[in-house]
Design a protein with these regions (language model features):
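Extracellular/periplasmic, surface-exposed regions of secreted and cell-surface proteins
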Residues: 18, 24-43, 47, 51-52, ...
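Conserved SET/PR-domain catalytic core that frames the SAM/AdoMet-binding pocket
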Residues: 472, 543, 553-567, 661-666
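Conserved small-residue
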Residues: 225, 437, 451-551, 582, ...
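A short beta-strand motif that forms part of the nucleic acid-binding face
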Residues: 2-4, 41, 288, 408, ...
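Glycine-rich, aromatic-lined ligand/substrate-binding cores of catalytic
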Residues: 550-585
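Extracytoplasmic gating/loop element in the C-terminal half of outer-membrane beta-barrel translocons
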Residues: 92-99, 291, 521, 577-678, ...
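Periplasmic-side early beta-strands and strand-to-turn transitions of outer-membrane beta-barrels
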Residues: 3-16, 50
Length: 728
């Protein structure tokens, strides 16, 4: 098969192309020996401007567009030169159009090759026994090239107090005034080998299946990159042509980077399945996995992972006479799994850092070496003990099907940073990482299906529902001296951290009789916070903590509806989630506490943030003396560390949603016509994705599936596809 895909982005000069080819070959050499090979290749080409649209990057292009002021002109002339106008007041280089068209270009080419070959031998003198050898080679090569061209904007400067004069000044791109060229190459390959023996046999009412397997995997990667500065001619954009000078003529040293990695893992698997009269089912399994990440001398390099499952097909019992029930099965399972849990192979080593001019000896600044990480040779796998009980039910030949499961998972030996977990008497010499974190995961899920035929009409539905609750049983980062509301232990995984809000201040009298932040101006219409420790003041150290809200949904569900009639078919998928909280505050500025990721306003919560535009709802629904029931605080253009800027329950919103994920309409021409045309089948279809979304976040223009609101994000797209599927 051959495929081609071409898509332009929502942002100008963004393009993605994909070319792919696949070939599968199955050959039967003789009655006992067969061979198969699968080959797949893919080329991806991404082109974009020199300025990023990555949602994790500050001032990315979508964010610039969202916060653009509508009243500034598109261009402005300064000293006879025309410049794009910054779309914010008193803020340089911010112009989404210029960022998309004048910042250079970035081209990334990813080439993938995936190969898989297998040889199977069916033992002629032992029925049901076969041996299989499989090998795969996967390769990925990336070549990236980025030309950064600086640009200037005309920035509207607000008048000085007491004047009415507006002026424009020329401002340089924050990336500097020097053209640069960055090139990088990345190579990765993975080799996997798999040797297995399978056996299937029946002896009267007894059925046995057995598997023995050995697998190895080796991965190597290498990357190298370089950036050169100073390009006299963009048409000669080569690293050999850079001048290594900045726009003012000073020297600019080029940067060179490189890294490589080599990993290995191996595993052994054994599994036995037994069934008696297909009524009573038993499965025993065990994995024995090893990884290079763990030290062999610690005894933790290898881990044994047993599992067992039981099943009872009750409907096959002789005494079971409910003929309308097609299936009634009870089952239970227990097992252990393990992961490396993001462990780095260097975590078992002591790491040292060289600090320059750290102390003075003899009147001279001296460098020093200190231990930045104390290695732990006893680090081990993160493990999960899983337990599940379920039932499968099917009746009336598919009119009603039910699958129901209740599960519990205990996760332990999770990688943790143990800094602060030991007393000062240790002098700071303790392991930097350990396997101390623990959490559990419990819930249930069910699936209900319905399928029916009425004449030429076939229709059906599938409802899926899942509830899961995860909590920290122990979190090593908790300080023993902290109040309970500042500890993660015992709280839900994904719990949000912030103040508890108690509405908005309505009067000066209320402010005087309430706990407030001593270093923040507070006026009527500002957020009122709960004094959690009761000391009469609001402080980050004492009153911020975890609240009963999680960024992860507890409930997820979907509904698939389908029907076909005389060649016409329709298929739709609805999906949604509830029990999730979304915060309108973000984490991309250096907050008042001097730490990232805890509190900050965004353009969704602060009018005219950083001199940019505001959503209309933020002003129309703000508190004013005439609108004291407003949803948002009193409008303010003070600094980001103002009273209202902190993460709090005031900014938390229900993240529940229901979305029409896909809708497909199709028609398959009659078989006799397709065969007359030399085809087995011919189908044409129209499909749409992300067509409708019902969510309380819609009014904030926030996609409920987005990971965060920090810097804006690339939006979910409505996609329409018209396709033809031909089978020969």
């Amino acid at each position: 098969s051959i495929g081609y895909f071409d898509q332009n982005g929502n942002v100008q000069n963004f393009n993605y192309k994909r070319y792919n080819i696949r070939s599968n070959v199955d050959t039967k050499i003789n009655d006992f020996l067969s061979f198969e090979m699968n080959l797949a290749g893919r080329l991806e080409v991404r082109n974009q401007p020199g300025f990023s649209a990555n949602p994790d990057d500050w001032n990315n292009i979508p964010q610039q567009a969202v916060r653009a002021l509508p009243y500034v002109p598109e261009y402005y002339e300064i000293d006879g030169v025309t410049y794009p106008v910054s779309t914010r007041t008193n803020s340089s280089y911010v112009n989404p159009d210029a960022a998309a068209t004048q910042t250079g270009n970035s081209n990334t080419r990813n080439t993938y090759l995936q190969t898989n070959a297998a040889l199977r031998y069916d033992v002629p003198f032992v029925k049901g026994l076969c041996f299989k050898a499989m090998g795969s080679y996967d390769m990925m090569f990336q070549n990236a090239r980025r030309i950064a061209t600086p640009y200037y904007t005309a920035v509207l400067t607000l008048p000085v107090a007491g004047t009415t004069d507006l002026s424009y000044i020329r401002s340089a791109d924050a990336r500097g005034t020097t053209k640069s060229l960055t090139e990088s190459a990345y190579y990765n390959y993975a080799i996997t080998t798999n040797l297995s023996a399978n056996y299937e046999g029946e002896f009267g009412k007894h059925s046995i299946k057995a598997l023995a397997l050995m697998e190895t995997r080796e991965v190597k990667s290498h990357t190298i990159g370089a950036t050169g500065y100073g390009l006299d001619f963009l048409s000669l954009a080569e690293l050999s042509k850079v001048t290594n000078k900045t726009g003012d003529g000073s020297e600019k040293i080029p940067s060179i980077s490189g890294a490589s990695s080599h990993t290995r893992a191996a595993g052994f698997v054994g599994r036995v399945n037994y069934a008696y009269a297909q009524k009573y089912l038993l499965e025993l399994s065990c994995r024995y996995d090893g990884s290079y990440v763990f030290l062999n001398k610690s005894g933790n390099r290898w881990v044994a992972l047993p599992g067992v499952s039981l099943g009872w097909n009750m409907h096959k019992e002789d005494w079971f006479d409910a003929s309308w029930i097609n299936e009634l099965k009870l089952r239970a399972s227990a097992g252990k799994t393990a992961t490396q849990n993001g462990l780095n192979a260097t975590y078992y080593m002591d790491l040292f850092t060289v600090a320059g001019n750290s102390l003075v000896l003899g009147g001279v600044n001296q460098g020093m070496v200190y231990a930045s990480t104390i290695g732990n040779p006893n680090l081990t796998w993160a493990k999960v003990d899983s337990y599940d009980v379920g039932v499968d039910f099917n009746a009336w030949n598919g009119l009603l099907g039910i699958e129901f499961d209740v599960f519990y998972k205990y996760e332990y030996d999770i990688l943790s940073s143990v800094t602060g977990s030991y007393s000062p008497s240790r002098g700071g010499y303790y392991y930097s990482y350990g396997n101390e974190n623990k959490r559990d995961y419990r819930g249930f899920d069910f699936t209900i299906t319905h399928n029916n035929y009425i004449g030429d009409l076939n229709y059906g539905a599938k409802l899926m529902f899942s509830y899961a609750y995860r909590r920290w049983l122990y979190y090593a980062g908790d300080s023993p001296n902290a109040p309970e509301y500042q500890k993660l232990t015992g709280k839900e995984v994904g719990s949000l951290y912030g103040y508890i809000a108690d509405g908005l201040f309505q009067s000066e009298s209320e402010i005087r009789h309430s706990a407030v932040m001593s270093d923040k101006a507070v006026v009527p219409g500002y957020i009122k916070y709960v004094d959690r420790n009761g000391d009469g003041q609001i402080t980050y150290a004492q009153d911020m903590g975890y609240v009963a809200a999680s960024a992860y949904p507890r409930v997820q569900y979907s509904l698939n509806l389908y029907a076909n009639w005389k060649g016409f078919d329709i298929d739709m998928l609805w999906q949604g989630a509830t029990g999730r909280t979304v915060s309108l505050t973000g984490e991309y500025s250096y907050a008042a506490t001097g730490s990232y990721g805890i509190m900050d306003n965004t353009f969704l919560t602060k009018p005219f943030y950083h001199g940019g535009n505001s959503p209309l709802y933020l002003l129309e629904n703000s508190w004013t003396p005439d609108n004291k029931s407003g949803e948002f605080p009193r409008p303010s253009i003070t600094t980001v560390s103002s009273n209202n800027a902190f993460s709090s329950t005031f900014w938390y919103r229900d993240g529940s949603y229901l979305r029409l994920k896909t809708l497909q309409l199709g028609y398959t021409i009659p078989t006799k016509i397709s065969k007359f045309m030399g085809m087995s089948s011919f189908r044409v279809y129209l499909q749409g994705s992300n067509l409708l979304t019902f969510s309380g976040l819609n009014k904030y223009h926030i996609d409920p599936e987005q990971p965060g609101v920090n810097n804006g994000y690339y939006p979910q797209q409505k996609v329409y596809q018209l396709g033809v599927k031909i089978t020969f």
